[in-house]
Amino acid sequence: VVIHTLPAMAQAAALAIDSMEWNEVVGTVAGDDTIFVAVREQDDVNEIVSRFKKLMKP
């Protein structure tokens, strides 16, 4: 899963994702404005995307 953030915010957001300790997430790699989220199983991708969408709702 790839997530785009505001410039210079990817590392902070990746740290927050890592701290959630979701079993489906193996880990994250963050650049300046992009995060790669490694998901354990292909079948878990839709669940993870759904969780991120819920977190981003206003």
Model-derived segments and spans:
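Non-DNA-binding regulatory cores of transcription-related proteins
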Residues: 1-49
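C-terminal output/interaction extensions
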Residues: 51-57
